[in-house]
Amino acid sequence: MKNILDFTLEELKEWMKENGESAFRAKQIFDWIYKKEVFNFEEMKNISKALIGKLSENFYIGIPEVIDYLSSSEDGTRKILLGLGDGNIIECVIMRYKYGNSICVSTQIGCRMGCKFCASTLEGMVRNLTAGEILSEVLIGQKLLGERISNIVLMGSGEPLDNYDNVMKFLELVNADYGLNIGQRHITLSTCGLVPKIREMADKEMQVTLAISLHAVSDEKRKTIMPIANKYSISEILDACNYYIEKTGRRITFEYSLVSGVNDTKEDAKSLGRLLKGMLCHVNLIPVNEIKENEFKKSTKKDIETFLNTLKTYGVEATVRREMGSDINAACGQLRRSYIKSKGLKL
């Protein structure tokens, strides 16, 4: 049995022809799934019983079970805990902005990158999500919300470029006009800096916004909080980013989690300003999410403001990320981890 959400329209048309059906049936089925949010073959009214039988024998519509659905009383942020068919659990977050609804999706179950301040990496890597499983987060999120999701950020659990092929196919599926038709410029992909994959993605000349999890201004300091820094230097990452800008014309976002006493001094801000001065980029300053498993503390408001203002003196565009859903632990990995522990399950 295959997850039909993993299929492109052309792939499903080919299956139809191979199984004695008209190719146009593929579009009808996808209309039911993507336009009408019908996730059961039996409910597709203009599909013959014979074809429904064939579909049921060969495919399933991989919509996950909703285990928990939390809504923030502060800002309307929604956090969804989802159960997959194999018993694994993932989570996604919907954030409401003036310009529309944005969903933060997971691309892996767990993560093997080992970043010290991230909850999703604490139990290590379980497995990659397929393109259809990533897509299902958007589908179920949109159905639960009852409104269109217009923006996607690949910033949930997992390193997207460590699941490159599935993520690239997801981007194709979610952008397709027969599907959700979410434009590439409305999608942001966050990576800790897998240099070869950044360059490979640049060669596709996609219009996806690339966000780099930087979090330190020297290789030495970065190695203490991000193991990937032992493989790729900041210089190599910046070279890859400039290549991405050259190929796509898109501005790079640099994510910088501010950790009290670790990377939030005025000297750190000056070093970051010198590093990025003149580059087509934007810095997103993130007050770190505190988790029990480490001792990292959030920077003070005064230190955050000083850091921000110092960056601006170098002509570097920067903003402080608005904290959303703090009353429901909306940071990636937190809800999944607390749920698994509460049930006494193995991480």
Swiss-Prot record:
Q: Which Pfam families match?
A: Radical_SAM (PF04055), RlmN_N (PF21016)
- Please give the cofactor(s) recorded in the UniProt entry for this protein: [4Fe-4S] cluster
Q: Where does S-adenosyl-L-methionine bind?
A: G158, E159, S190, S213, L214, H215, N289
Q: What is its EC number?
A: 2.1.1.192
Give a yes or no for keyword Iron-sulfur in this entry. Answer: yes
Q: Which PANTHER family match?
A: 23S RRNA METHYLTRANSFERASE, RADICAL SAM CORE DOMAIN-CONTAINING PROTEIN
Q: What is this protein called?
A: Probable dual-specificity RNA methyltransferase RlmN
